[in-house]
């Protein structure tokens, strides 16, 4: 958080110096001017469509002056798939939904920019329904277990459950990107912005809940309800699940700095900046 704040303050200070009508080291830096033909603040509007790891994105931007744009972003994407891992079949769905804003800073009269910002709305997550057919094996934390067959007498049912991978620990995630291209170009109306950076979404969370009956042997002579920690079989299965969850969380920890790489096409309305 402190590093992001330092970067943002440094970028803003540098840009203000570039835009101020003062003299530094004997050179006069470019000032923000609103002469004939110049675009006044909020006088231009641009829309952009593109893709990024956050999903299919739609953006809108307006000019503040010749060095600053204010940009809003919305991202949406869903994808469903079914796969089997370690004997567990998962019907998974990726849901990406986020929205945020950025201040595009152009320190030079070119397409290069620095963009501090934040995701104000972040509902990115993966959900899954898990099943293990009765009589088949599965592994948790390198331990082999067996899913019980349905039995009306004992009440046994095959192992099943749900899982949620949260990519939204920080409900407001600060971001910093850099890139090339101005959604509000000095000439023409079309532009092709590109940016790269990251959002600090926080460490991903993993929550897996399994139910049904689990066995220690294929013959199903030593079985228990998965949730029955009072039974040695259930206790062993729950312990293996908790350890496995911790490993998944560790493996996914690098995603706390969520990558942003995006490109798209933009169209702007209104007059042009000089």
List each model region and its residues.
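Membrane-embedded beta-strand positions of outer-membrane beta-barrel proteins
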Residues: 47-49, 60, 72, 103, ...
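Outer-membrane beta-barrel "beta-signal"
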Residues: 255-274
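Outer-envelope beta-barrel architecture signal
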Residues: 39-45, 56, 66-68, 110-112, ...
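Outer-membrane beta-barrel strand-turn architecture
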Residues: 64-68, 105-110, 182-186, 269-273
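Extracellular/periplasm-exposed beta-strand and loop segments of Gram-negative cell-envelope proteins
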Residues: 33-40, 74-101, 123-172, 202-260
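Transmembrane beta-strands of outer-membrane beta-barrel pores
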Residues: 51-55, 74-80, 107, 118-124, ...
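Transmembrane beta-barrel domains of outer membrane proteins
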Residues: 38, 50-52, 59-61, 104-106, ...
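Cleavable N-terminal export/targeting peptides
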Residues: 1-36, 230, 270-274
